[in-house]
From Swiss-Prot:
Phosphoserine modified-residue sites: 655
Pathway terms, separated by semicolons: Protein modification; protein ubiquitination
Chain positions of all zinc fingers (RING-type): 12-53
EC numbers: 2.3.2.27
Name of the featured protein: E3 ubiquitin-protein ligase SH3RF2
Stretches assigned to the SH3 domain: 125-184, 187-252, 382-443
Stated role: Has E3 ubiquitin-protein ligase activity. Acts as an anti-apoptotic regulator of the JNK pathway by ubiquitinating and promoting the degradation of SH3RF1, a scaffold protein that is required for pro-apoptotic JNK activation. Facilitates TNF-alpha-mediated recruitment of adapter proteins TRADD and RIPK1 to TNFRSF1A and regulates PAK4 protein stability via inhibition of its ubiquitin-mediated proteasomal degradation. Inhibits PPP1CA phosphatase activity.
Organism: Mus musculus
Localization in the cell: Nucleus
Amino acid sequence: MDDLTLLDLLECPVCFEKLDVTAKVLPCQHTFCKPCLQRIFKAHKELRCPECRTLVFCSIEALPANLLLVRLLDGVRSGQSSWKGGSFRRPRILTLQDNRKAKSSPRSLQASPFRLVPSVRIHMDGVPRAKALCNYRGKNPGDLKFNKGDVILLRRQLDENWYQGEINGVSGIFPASSVEVIKQLPQPPPLCRALYNFDLRDKDKSENQDCLTFLKDDVITVISRVDENWAEGKLGDKVGIFPILFVEPNVSARHLLENKGHQLSRTRHLSLMSSPSRGKATNTSSLRKSPGSRRKGSGQFSMTTALNTLNRTVHSPEGHQMVEISTPMLISSNSPSVLTQHGDKADFPTSSTGQVSSSQPAPASPGHSTAMVSVPSSQQHLSNNMFVALHTYSAHRPEELDLQKGEGIRVLGKYQDGWLKGLSLLTGRTGIFPSDYVIPVFSSTARKTSSFPDSRSPTVCTTWALSTSSVSSQGSFAEGDPRQSGPFKSVFVPTAVVNPSRSTPGPGSSGQGSLRKVRSSMRKNGSLQRPVQSGIPTFMVGSLRCSPTMVIRPQRFQFYPPQGMTPSPTPIMVEMGSKSIYTGEPALTCINRGSKTRIHSAGNSIIMEGKETPIKSEPPPKPPASAPPSILVKPENSKNGTEKQVKTVRFQNYSPPPTKHSASSPTSGKHDHPATLKGSQHEAVSSGGEMTILFAHRSGCHSGQQTDLRRKSAFGKTMPLLSTASATQTLFPSK
């Protein structure tokens, strides 16, 4: 641009004449020529700006001159063009190039009469700048060209590798690796742009009042990160939390969220390594903070009920613990030591790897899932809609829900045939998923049956039923028991019902039918909670029921297991007859009550293990030809165990003469108590024949050890010698 073109642009907006140094600047910063201002004042007797109609209170002579115009005209007349490379040079800035020209040109040393403002070097201390490390010429039109050692003014940072800067009035971009930053650019505020609308106030105003409501394309100022999925932000004068996936953060906000996320993950990892239980308690307490504990002002924002509402698994009443997914940990159901350690919390079935941990006994999961769910006993009603994913499922439609193996699901209802609608406890998302991909955590009606049709096997029909084993809460534990913290509640214990293959039909069949009725009523009622007193006669049914792995706590004359016989830690032998009962220290009473049999023991904790699968080993000693038929139950031993456990059930062929005994009314609810214990024993002898029971502790017997059990009964017969190589042998009279 030449000087003539520049002078043509400098004209008065009123008369369109060329401006000169006599032009005046009004208080509104508009510039007009002096003759135009005089004509306006003469015509209207006052001076107002022709552009904005601003009133001028001083005279025309008192108005200042336009300093920029004076400098431009001075530069044009002196032959120095003020336009360099198409960029207008700022006033009051003296570059290094101007300094060189001033020293080399003697003409510039003479003061100009029109130069009113001195050129002063700009203060560079607070200006973001960088020093060039090498020559850069650039290949694209927008690249900035500079030489080594040049000082470049930084305008903004495009990304981690590129800057936009200015040198000698020329702006462009250049790589960050070619310069050394002397003064960093001020960091932009951490902002994020909303990608979707977010509003939860209509759902639950009381619990979602701490959520930050925004619309799409709103700009939110990020304050801090709350957890992996939530951040705290400010929009206008409102402060709240919002989901991170709903916004797009800028560079500063991304760095802030990433640094906070790393700190949260590191803190959580250290807390879990140091104290898992304390970390879980701290996490739960932080999730359940009341809204009143939130800090006031724009400082740190504590996570309150809004985050708790979206991340919690179920709605629990006040004062109750929340259901939470604990760290997975598999406990072998065949290890009695582990079961003894966790005996205070729950009973573990052998076919399940689920863990139930609570302060009071709670039902364990009957399924084969590896999901670990901690449910307090006060919230057993939540088991109806709690499910665990058996397999991983990828969603094929937007309304479907992704499932991870072992993930907890809260089922909200049935969507259609084969599909359920539920809430993921891991992600908090709601959707539909196939029903065959999940399994309920608890189910009071779930039963898994498996039958062995081979008649030669030790068990003709083995049925796994989810039976209900309960202990009367009216009694008390033994004194000094450290585990006595509260009354027992009904727990689920899988039991194996072994029916003998050669039991002859007779009175026993009706007894088994009544047993099935009682068992069905037990399942309906949920538990057997009636007190049992010592000395009440009982009756043994022709079936052996035992739990493969079961932990039983003692209770003084109140233990009432429906599984039948349970061994005691010390050898016990009971002989039914007119003689006195000979037992070990833990008293065991076998008495008669009409047509039902129970064995009540007040011994210490009992662990009984056994599996119904037979193992191939040397056959047991065969009884003589004259001996009555018997069934040998030989459970499979554990892999690491060296002891063998043999159970023999022998049924006598002869039937003793029936005797009269008092029968109680089934509907009266009262039991007939015998006058003396001897009378009860005498009735048991007359009705049940002779019966010898041997309980051998697993660690108390060795292979080859024999116990002489030859004792005379009331009938004057001698029992044969029984070998007890870690065995439990029971002889029952046939029905």
